[in-house]
């Protein structure tokens, strides 16, 4: 569990890529949609690891799965930044390039996180799948 600055605890799952992969220094930070939890996205994460040889870090927002709290727009952005900071500070991943990937609700989270961290030279990409730009329509503040 990863603690947030506002004292929630977030569940996460890290899938390491193959040991000597040329993409071993790349981690995809994956944000899921509103329906389900990270467990439902494991097949996608595994496919990314197998096809690209990268690592995948999947975060479960507050109020989803095993994470504590209740979801709202502010909280989801705290969760996203917490995950990003965790990857940037963790010994195993601090030197990795990061691609942020968001599905549906996770796309709105991903866009805001990428905008907030756009000056980080290790943030090298943003992937959006079936997304929208406003979380308020789905998760009220």
How would you describe each model-predicted region?
Residues 109-141:
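Hydrolase active-site cap/lid region
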Residues 23-26, 95-97, 122:
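Short coil/turn segments at beta-strand junctions that form active-site/ligand-binding loops
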Residues 53-54, 93-94, 121:
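A generic structural motif
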Residues 93-104:
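Alpha/beta-hydrolase fold nucleophile elbow
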Residues 87, 91:
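Hydrophobic pocket-lining residues that define ligand/cofactor binding sites across diverse proteins
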Residues 2-86:
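Membrane-embedded segments
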Residues 36, 63, 107, 133-134:
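Active-site micro-motifs of SAM-dependent methyltransferase domains
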Residues 57, 101, 127:
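Conserved Rossmann-like nucleotide-binding pocket used by diverse enzymes
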């Amino acid at each position: 569990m990863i603690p947030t600055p506002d004292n929630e605890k977030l569940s996460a799952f890290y899938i390491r890529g193959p040991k000597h992969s040329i993409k071993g220094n790349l981690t995809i930070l994956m944000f899921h949609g509103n329906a389900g939890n990270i467990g439902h996205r494991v097949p996608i994460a595994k496919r990314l690891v197998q096809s690209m040889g990268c690592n995948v870090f999947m975060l479960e927002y507050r109020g989803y799965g095993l994470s504590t709290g209740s979801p709202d727009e502010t909280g989801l952005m705290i969760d996203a930044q917490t995950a990003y900071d965790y990857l940037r500070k963790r010994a195993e991943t601090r030197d990795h390039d990061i691609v942020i990937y968001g599905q549906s609700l996770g796309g709105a989270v991903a866009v805001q996180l990428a905008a907030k961290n756009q000056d980080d030279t290790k943030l090298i990409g943003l992937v959006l799948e079936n997304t929208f730009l406003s979380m308020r329509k789905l998760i009220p503040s």
